[in-house]
Amino acid sequence: MINESMSMRNSVKAIWWAMLAVCACMVCACGNATEQSHTEQVKQHQKKVVAPKKKTVHVYFFDGFKDALGKNTIKELDEVFDSVEFEGVIPYPDSAYYAPRNRYKADKLVRHLKALQKGTSDLEIGFASKDISAAVHGHDDFGIMGWTRISLKTAVVSTFRVKGANAQNRDFFKLVIHELGHTEGLQHCKNSRTCYMRDAKGTYHLHELTDFCPTCKAHLIKRGWHLR
């Protein structure tokens, strides 16, 4: 009986140890599976996160544009974009000249710049000093400071209507950054009177602008702009 009892105890112990071993294997397997699952999730997330393409702005000076102002503006743009390339001085195209008002059609200047575009994700902008105009605000030929079409990637700006456009002029930089904002898909901003994307509506308001509002800023940061 004693031998039989001991035998039974040994059998129970063997079964118990076997069950522990199985449980341990299951825990290890579960842990490995969980670890592998987490690793796969991280890999999937990394695949989804795509860094914005390098943002390059190509700057052209139309004949007669102030060199000092242009260089200072390019220096400021360097803090916002990955790369800013000065592409040289170019003549005003005859096709853009509007003789009745002795000025240039902005849309035709932009079309001229568009033909010079370097890359599909790059931005092109022309700095002009002569008066420019466009069909806006119910007028066929309305004098403006800058022009582009939303997401066109190409713009033109002029110092003709910018007050005190000297080498250190901050208003001209605000004008440039406003038009480049349009090239990246931003409409005129109604959230803040101090946002760079506020609509001038035919008035001079550049001195009132201080920064992009949070909404406009978030939009541009997603597109690779370096904004604080």
Describe each region flagged by the PLM.
Residues 67-175, 183, 187:
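Metzincin-family zinc-dependent endopeptidase catalytic domain
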Residues 27-29:
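C-terminal motif of bacterial Sec signal peptides marking the signal peptidase cleavage site
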Residues 178:
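Conserved phosphoacceptor histidine of two-component systems
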Residues 4-19:
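Bacterial N-terminal signal peptides that target proteins for export
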